[in-house]
UniProtKB/Swiss-Prot annotation:
NCBIfam families: PRK03467.1 (NF002900). This is UPF0306 protein YhbP. It comes from the Bacteria. Belongs to the UPF0306 family. The gene is yhbP. InterPro entries: Split_barrel_FMN-bd (IPR012349), UPF0306 (IPR011194). SUPFAM superfamilies: FMN-binding split barrel.
């Protein structure tokens, strides 16, 4: 199975991302419900500009994070670690992402928070259901996939 396809299928079944940003040596992490775009390999989230993580991100910033389940045994651990870039969307790009986000999370229609894109440049997917410590790696710019 193609690495990105396997990762995308799993991410589409999850809904909470943890991401971390840094500014002047200070780190901060946050959680949010996400919409995953398989074509752009990106998460879309809503978060207010007044939050600490949004203030630290500014209009765009380097980001790293995780998506994971809550398995009861080590044999069932599956999760993603990633790095990339977070940026606030504007105009039509924001409108289109918000429409898609609202389809997945209808309650979000009540929120006015800006839409942010987390573009993934590197993904490591651990899937112990395929064997203990099984890792799949996807890199945006090299076209490299490792299983």
């Amino acid at each position: 199975m193609e690495t990105l396809t396997a990762i995308s299928r799993w991410l589409e079944k999850q809904h909470v991302v943890t991401w971390c940003v840094q500014q002047e040596g200070e780190l901060w992490c946050a959680n949010a419900f996400y919409l995953f775009d398989t074509q752009k390999v990106a998460f879309y989230i809503l978060t207010e500009e007044k939050t600490r993580h949004a203030q630290m991100s500014g209009p765009q910033a380097a980001v790293a994070g995780t998506v994971n389940g809550q398995p009861k045994t080590v044999a069932l651990i599956r999760g993603v670690q990633f790095k990339g870039e977070i940026r606030r969307l504007e105009g039509e790009e924001s409108d289109l992402a918000r429409q898609a986000y609202n389809r997945r999370f209808p309650v979000a229609r009540m929120l006015s928070a800006p839409v942010w894109e987390i573009r993934l440049d590197e993904i490591k997917f651990t899937d112990n259901t395929l064997g203990f410590g099984k890792k799949m790696i996807w890199l945006r710019n090299s076209g490299t996939e490792q299983a």
